[in-house]
Amino acid sequence: MNKFEDIRGVAFDLDGTLVDSAPGLAAAVDMALYALELPIAGEERVITWIGNGADVLMERALTWARQERATQRKTMGKPPVDDDIPAEEQVRILRKLFDRYYGEVAEEGTFLFPHVADTLGALQAKGLPLGLVTNKPTPFVAPLLEALDIAKYFSVVIGGDDVQNKKPHPDPLLLVAERMGIAPQQMLFVGDSRNDIQAAKAAGCPSVGLTYGYNYGEAIDLSQPDVIYQSINDLLPALGLPHSENQESKND
């Protein structure tokens, strides 16, 4: 049974929705922290920082690393470190290092979630234009989509550097709807985090929240999307298509 009426396009978030990018992001964050002689965070912690773009990711990483370093030194009976470099400058340096390292590990550290390719293919075959809206820095987006063999499904791709205001601001979603030539209420937006759902609500788009993403450790139902699914292929019956049961490995 269709849950959505008059949907003429579908747009997706990337990290935590279509792809598990945490391994690559965490590796790059830790390499950048290590280069500045700061404690490394690990994937489990970095996952809670993903979703607001690279600059915010660096701010969260630096804040945690400075606090962690202070705690470690206090435990060892050592005096605190006086940072000669202001935090804002350290964030800028950390971001530069992160970009370099992430460029090296992004493809090998990013995997499609199950059923993503089948679902995108089924929606495209139905004739629905598909869009991508991500806060990820734009230079990383196209190469990653190509490496994962899903670039072919999207008619509109908006990266984090393509708009002045990133999600949760509605501008990226409004831009995608405009380029699709449809009204915002005719574009379904699918994401895994409160930023995604807030952006969809602000833009006037119906929303789907997926339970398996990152979302800062919060349950997606707290953001009150219109519908919550555990798997991305649950979209298909909601849009009048048969449910795909094809299995995909992370490396497909």
Swiss-Prot record:
Enzyme class: hydrolase
InterPro entries in the cross-refs: HAD-like_hydrolase_sf, HAD-like_sf, HAD-SF_hydro_IA, HAD_sf, PGP-like_dom2, PGPase_prok
Keyword Metal-binding in annotation: yes
EC number(s) recorded for this UniProt protein: 3.1.3.18
Cofactor: Mg(2+); chloride
A biological process term (GO) from this entry: carbohydrate metabolic process
Keyword annotations of the record: Carbohydrate metabolism, Chloride, Hydrolase, Magnesium, Metal-binding
A GO MF label: metal ion binding
Superkingdom field: Bacteria
Catalytic activity line of the entry: 2-phosphoglycolate + H2O = glycolate + phosphate
CDD domains in the record: HAD_PGPase
Function: Specifically catalyzes the dephosphorylation of 2-phosphoglycolate. Is involved in the dissimilation of the intracellular 2-phosphoglycolate formed during the DNA repair of 3'-phosphoglycolate ends, a major class of DNA lesions induced by oxidative stress.
Stored HAMAP family: GPH_hydrolase_bact
Record's subunit section: Monomer.
Family, per entry: Belongs to the HAD-like hydrolase superfamily. CbbY/CbbZ/Gph/YieH family.
Name of the protein: Phosphoglycolate phosphatase
Organism this protein belongs to: Shigella sonnei (strain Ss046)
